[in-house]
Amino acid sequence: MATANGAHLFNHYSSNSRFIHFTSRNTSSKLFLTKTSHFRRPKRCFHVNNTLSEKIHHPITEQGGESDLSSFAPDAASITSSIKYHAEFTPVFSPERFELPKAFFATAQSVRDSLLINWNATYDIYEKLNMKQAYYLSMEFLQGRALLNAIGNLELTGAFAEALKNLGHNLENVASQEPDAALGNGGLGRLASCFLDSLATLNYPAWGYGLRYKYGLFKQRITKDGQEEVAEDWLEIGSPWEVVRNDVSYPIKFYGKVSTGSDGKRYWIGGEDIKAVAYDVPIPGYKTRTTISLRLWSTQVPSADFDLSAFNAGEHTKACEAQANAEKICYILYPGDESEEGKILRLKQQYTLCSASLQDIISRFERRSGDRIKWEEFPEKVAVQMNDTHPTLCIPELMRILIDLKGLNWNEAWNITQRTVAYTNHTVLPEALEKWSYELMQKLLPRHVEIIEAIDEELVHEIVLKYGSMDLNKLEEKLTTMRILENFDLPSSVAELFIKPEISVDDDTETVEVHDKVEASDKVVTNDEDDTGKKTSVKIEAAAEKDIDKKTPVSPEPAVIPPKKVRMANLCVVGGHAVNGVAEIHSEIVKEEVFNDFYELWPEKFQNKTNGVTPRRWIRFCNPPLSAIITKWTGTEDWVLKTEKLAELQKFADNEDLQNEWREAKRSNKIKVVSFLKEKTGYSVVPDAMFDIQVKRIHEYKRQLLNIFGIVYRYKKMKEMTAAERKTNFVPRVCIFGGKAFATYVQAKRIVKFITDVGATINHDPEIGDLLKVVFVPDYNVSVAELLIPASDLSEHISTAGMEASGTSNMKFAMNGCIQIGTLDGANVEIREEVGEENFFLFGAQAHEIAGLRKERADGKFVPDERFEEVKEFVRSGAFGSYNYDDLIGSLEGNEGFGRADYFLVGKDFPSYIECQEKVDEAYRDQKRWTTMSILNTAGSYKFSSDRTIHEYAKDIWNIEAVEIA
């Protein structure tokens, strides 16, 4: 391809070889490339021009001036040139070969060239307009592969496919070389990534902030012993997407102490200092120039902290200790926290995310403000969204920066913080509502503990003002449940309310104890605040004086002193202006159960924002056959941005032509999965069987155990029948599981082991053959989901009712025409409403029944179903190997005790579940009916686009406006 300076680079192809002619400025060299793609570099120097980069960096119009890059769209020829350029001059691999890994890196670098134009334009317009910007802080971002998503959003899929074909490669094969970014694990991180996609697509000014984990959570292997965890070094050869910003780094402090200076201010001094360095990843929107940033923090120490003397003295470990301590903060996601060291590391991770991100946000606010910084305008320019409780330390950290570093007083800083920060709750599980050891936090973050104590005291006084002191029992109950600090004495001002007085009388008179009543009109009077926000003196003025000689505090019976804790979820609710659940039923549980006391105090804070998923990744790009059908029958591609157009499929649901196309698309996706399962597990399955899939984090409340018990029951019944009876009573099924159990979650790992043992037995049973297969897919991730979900016939969302906040995989399955079996839990409730009750297989107890059922169990009144007992006995018989499953089955037995009594109601819901599965078989036999149900699931999934969710966040919580990059 000719260039401005006369150099050119082009390819000629023959059936046996590839010929590339490199023309240098002074001489010409020719070389041949065989089919194995071995490069031989010419000895003399040559010039390879990157045509795409030339257009980006030096855009020249015919008139000689700069061109408008907004209309620049690379063609296949310029992309081919760009890929060659990066293969040669952006070296990651040795120069001799142009095999798939190198082709991927060169292609990704070429895509990044295109992204950079829009990325820089987006950054520039945000700087110039200085509009309010949202910042999404999350410990997880489960991005998946970026290549196909990026070129799809840029509308360059065809051009890149042609360019790679010119270079002897297939786009799909090249894309498969990309490792999934190991920055997340489950729904929390995938939701964050879907949100970033929607934010960019909808042109909202926003950034994401996270940590750059070197090894992610772990890579899962399945062995004869079950799950094995190994490090997943997804950055082993680097990432072509990230851009290190060496000029963007911030100091992070741990430990040390707090002292009062001569000016009366509090200073956090000493301790351990590291720095957080920014790595930026571009997030392109679909059919828009807007390209926002995901900024990831990596931790290190300044080079000055390297102990050169110790190193030269042979004390190498000591010399590198500071660097090692800093780097390990970003080694893995969710390090084990059974040990004190693990807890410290997790808290360091959370604080690093919060501190670095807030320093960056504040620096940007100050830069955009110019010479006159008005801190009261900070919430008008900044919205911080905390994705679950992991970023809770944003609240005391923002307070610390504003008070200690920017010179604001307590009231000013608290007003700004509350107007800036908002919190998304993702769980009703008590163990997931984080609590940190007060002692540990005080050691690691002493200044923040002072601020949290002051916030807690503010809260205590607000509770007293709300509820008064007429009913001290009620007040005590509210204080116990609502305080941020758990197992703490009350502030002295409030403790006086609970003092039990004694009246001294004559010796021959009976001593009587009375309570000193404080009327509702009593006032809480405080003096001015110091820089910690603590009250320097607080007292209660009673409406009437009592003639009491002596007051004696009530002393409890001697008991074990419970550990002091910091309740992070309570701090989130107190410190933010909005609290949202992620599904309608979940938000009601949040208001009525989880945070009911706070809802009574601040009802205006609580909202619902039902989750969503991006239709770009989860239909448009992962399921091209279905996408083409949707476009054909709706008459437009607009459904990718306006998913309400999916509803137009409803009127064609019974159309025979559509149904035939629909089934063919599903089958083509299933054929891909057949090959994938054979490659990854060694098991052979047939595409004409029903694909019954449950893929999600392994947890007892998600009830993979209920699913596999149902499969065991099905298998046992099959074994009791003749071959003819089996075919009459059961449709062929391939039951697919996927998901990771946390390394320290023993019971979840037992479930993985059990599933794989059941599969090993059933899959090798010649009597059963293809009538039933059980496959556990190792190392489930986004890329595997993109393969499995389009091929699914039935998906299982069977959590104990009231325990799943929302779920998002259920939305992805529905979008891809998969019919669901599930409980009335999380987003299942809304999905069932949208797709139609008759197109959803419902079973099980409902959320409002759960507490009563657990009490019934505790009272010994529960009678298990005979079929459930039959399954347990069958497992214990050794039908699935010699492994001792007593601990697993024992969790389903008994009426009380930790880890027993079937807390997640597997036994209670089992009969309802297997009867519902019989209805599934019946429906699947009628393929016309099943296909109609499938089409109506896709048509009814329009509500569950993350675009809708983001519009609601932007309007109701963040108060930000979209700005389109021209």
UniProtKB/Swiss-Prot annotation:
Q: Which GO terms describe its molecular function?
A: glycogen phosphorylase activity; identical protein binding; pyridoxal phosphate binding
Q: Which UniProt keywords apply?
A: Allosteric enzyme, Amyloplast, Carbohydrate metabolism, Chloroplast, Glycosyltransferase, Plastid, Pyridoxal phosphate, Transferase, Transit peptide
Q: InterPro entries per the record?
A: Glycg_phsphrylas (IPR011833), Glyco_trans_35 (IPR000811), Pyridoxal_P_attach_site (IPR035090)
N6-(pyridoxal phosphate)lysine modifications at: 812
Expression across tissues is: Tuber.
Does this UniProt record's set of keywords contain Ion transport?
Answer: no
Q: Which PROSITE patterns match?
A: PHOSPHORYLASE
For whether the record's keyword set contains Plastid, the answer is yes
**Catalytic reactions of this protein:** [(1->4)-alpha-D-glucosyl](n) + phosphate = [(1->4)-alpha-D-glucosyl](n-1) + alpha-D-glucose 1-phosphate
Instruction: Return the GO cellular component terms, semicolon-separated.
Output: amyloplast; chloroplast; cytoplasm
Q: Which cofactor does it need?
A: pyridoxal 5'-phosphate
Q: What SUPFAM superfamilies does UniProt report for this protein, alphabetically?
A: UDP-Glycosyltransferase/glycogen phosphorylase
- The primary location reported for this protein is plastid
Domain of life of the source? Eukaryota
Xref: NCBIfam families: P_ylase
Which family does the similarity line name? Answer: Belongs to the glycogen phosphorylase family.
Instruction: Summarize the protein's role.
Output: Phosphorylase is an important allosteric enzyme in carbohydrate metabolism. Enzymes from different sources differ in their regulatory mechanisms and in their natural substrates. However, all known phosphorylases share catalytic and structural properties.
Q: What is this protein called?
A: Alpha-1,4 glucan phosphorylase L-1 isozyme, chloroplastic/amyloplastic
